[in-house]
Amino acid sequence: MKNYKSIICVVAAVCLLGTAAFCGFRIYHYYAEVDEQTEAFEEIAEMVEQAPTDETVPDDAPVSEGEDVLAKYQELYLQNEDMVGWISIAGMTINYPVMQSRNNPNFYLKHNFEKEYSDLGTPYVQENCDIAESDNLVIYGHHIKGGKMFGALEDYKSKSFYEEHKTIQFDTLTEQTEYEIVAVFKTVAYSSEGFRYYDFVDAENEEDFNSYIGKCKELALYDTGVTAGYGDRLITLSTCEYSAQNGRLVVVAKKVG
């Protein structure tokens, strides 16, 4: 009987150690991937920074509506035609390509710029948004600890931080554009109690636009003193927020000029 109990204890200990080792490996693998993908994005950003600024892609390049790609995004666009823009915020770690895959809407939730599987994913635009025409571009990014990806948006919960970082740079392939932050708020997704901000892409009329902005201001964590009017172009940045189940942290900004 004692031998039987000893065997059970040994088996249990082996199983426990095996589980601990597996979990440890998974954690190590995750953070190793975070570091690897972070470095890869830094290399992509360096390509953009070092790119020439006075050339454009030839007229026969496959660009929407025949427009020319900005010189600094040429090489990246030719590597992956799912790229639709670039987002950055001065003084923050957010400095990434932005993708869109209309036929596979959430593809970049779990894929990197090279279309390889990645837990970090790549910031991407909601599939029903038209980069050139929509009133509101909804852009998603993972909330990764350490201020990586859209995890850096967590800092916008503080008004004092907002005061030092009031604008967002979001370039399309053909236009460099600055956006002014209108509101920062928290809500929950997939719930009747939450605000379905992701449903607003194109305003049906002025009332529809004002209703969206009004709800954003109502939920805002603080008053930015900035609002938006019918005809303004918006971007809405969305990432996970962990104070509630299916929580979301949302930053809404309007195009300047």
Give, region by region, the residue ranges found by the protein language model:
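Solvent-exposed, non-transmembrane regions of membrane-associated and secreted proteins
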Residues: 20-257
